[in-house]
């Protein structure tokens, strides 16, 4: 099955990010709706932003989070390297065309431990990135 994966890392400037996503949507529309497309990445725009709304209101792409039959998302995706940070803000997204169904969606919150200096048997939790990874189990219809 032919498929297209588009990765994005949007700017922090809200006007530019909305415009860049409109350009991406135009390119996807040029494919004529015939090819399955997955658009994923760090959009630096949460689920309430103009950028996000531009994408989901286009009816070209849907949010895997919203489509998932089973969802594991105890926090948002941006953690600022703080393992104790909790948020509902998702700035990392997986969008897909109607060629796909989403079985499961998850925000993976695994941390690792490092020894605390000058303290025996003491460890500190760390995040490997300032964003938690997002994963989806999808099926081509």
Residue ranges and their predicted role:
Residues 8-14:
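Glycine-rich phosphate-binding "P-loop"
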Residues 15-38, 43-141:
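Metal-dependent phosphoester-hydrolase catalytic domains
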